[in-house]
Amino acid sequence: QTLGGYWSVYWYEGRIYGTEIARGLDVFELTPSEYLSANEIAAARMAEQGRTVNPQQQYPVTWPAHPVVARAYMDQLARDKALKADVASRLTAVLDAATPLVDQARRSAAVARDLRAAAQALDVSGNGPTAQRLTALRDTLVRIADRVS
């Protein structure tokens, strides 16, 4: 009988590294599906974990103020049917305007104002995963606004 399975699995710089008992090291890369969007994968690649990885230290993971991170939250909310179409449309438009500004380190007071207005318009009531995602989306929009203002 062959014993198999993973001793440990870790995410680092866009890949999943697994220490498999029988084979050794497996390296996987995620692909978009109905359960995971391209935006979520791109946002995960942006996660700041530090250059040295020691999972036992359990450093907090942070994400930059970037439109792809906001879009990842939007995808999660849309998958749960927790984002109204008109809100999603408005958010998409303002993130479309913000993306080249962030990518090219440019500023726009008008786009920053629109981002803050979109953040303020989000209904972040209740608790649970939906409220946590809405709060994270709102906070990300404000941080993007700060970055482009």
Question: What residue ranges belong to the model's regions?
Answer:
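Feature marking well-ordered beta-strand scaffolds used for ligand recognition
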Residues: Q1-L77
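Mature extracytoplasmic or organellar-lumen-exposed domains after removal of signal/transit peptides
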Residues: R45-S149
